[in-house]
Amino acid sequence: MGNIEAFKALFLGFIEGLTEFLPISSTGHLILFGHLIDFHSDSGRAFEVVIQLGAILAVCWLYRKKIIDLVQGFFSGDQEARHFTFSVLMAFFPAVIIGVLAVDFIKSVLFSPLVVAIALIIGGLIIFWVESRDFKPSTTEATKITFKQAIAVGFIQCLAMIPGTSRSGATIIGGMLSGLSRKAATEFSFFLAMPTMLGAATYDLLRNADVLTSDNMLNIGLGFITAFISALFVVKALVRFVEKHTLRVFAWYRIVLGIIIMFVML
């Protein structure tokens, strides 16, 4: 395994952690940068899954106190903790069902620069539309989300299976459309990411376990570490950002990047 491939793994791990929780599509960026730097890994899909796991574990670490409080509250009979836990599970199940049914089609047909470019542009336009509304949220705390809102976010999250859409972008915008404040939607998106991404990672690792060997573990480990570290900074920064700013800057980024991809890579 060459030093160049190891450096590329570090770089892609950084990109994963940087983009996973921003509404700009981490999968889309991994596809694009993987093409640009000509990254080759024998572990293939397993590499992507493990670096995504690094990013989600960063969220688990940052929200560890809230997670512990929720678990303790759930088993001690705290109604708010139980309500929020069931809300997350309700939002999680649509992705499970649709993901299992459509995963092979999505990966074989939709993983291309053209799909990423189109999804980036459409997603950017949707963000502009949502942010242009007279936005008066009915729910300002993530733990107060209603079951109806949670289910709506869950179904909208399924759109993120299309590369370039962005799981965080879909869930944040879905939350805002259903009445959550920008911050509440962002924090609910983080909590929903935990079962969604951990479940997807487990499923994909089981399917790709045969390609995990001692020869490619260095690349995987390097990508995991950089994804974890960069995600730590991004999650904290995003929560502070959405408290005072709209998501329009991400909409501009998506549209410009999508146009560049169409002209340069296609």
Swiss-Prot record:
It is an enzyme of class 3 (hydrolase). It is found in: Cell inner membrane. It comes from the Bacteria. The chain crosses the membrane at residues 4-24, 43-63, 86-106, 109-129, 145-165, 186-206, 219-239, 246-266. It is a multi-pass membrane protein. It catalyses: di-trans,octa-cis-undecaprenyl diphosphate + H2O = di-trans,octa-cis-undecaprenyl phosphate + phosphate + H(+). Pfam families: BacA. Keywords: Antibiotic resistance, Cell inner membrane, Cell membrane, Cell shape, Cell wall biogenesis/degradation, Hydrolase, Membrane, Peptidoglycan synthesis, Transmembrane, Transmembrane helix. GO terms for cellular component: plasma membrane. GO terms for molecular function: undecaprenyl-diphosphatase activity. Its EC number is 3.6.1.27. InterPro entries: UppP (IPR003824). GO terms for biological process: cell wall organization; peptidoglycan biosynthetic process; regulation of cell shape; response to antibiotic. The keyword Cell inner membrane applies. Belongs to the UppP family. Catalyzes the dephosphorylation of undecaprenyl diphosphate (UPP). Confers resistance to bacitracin. Bacitracin is thought to be involved in the inhibition of peptidoglycan synthesis by sequestering undecaprenyl diphosphate, thereby reducing the pool of lipid carrier available. This is Undecaprenyl-diphosphatase 3. The gene is uppP3.
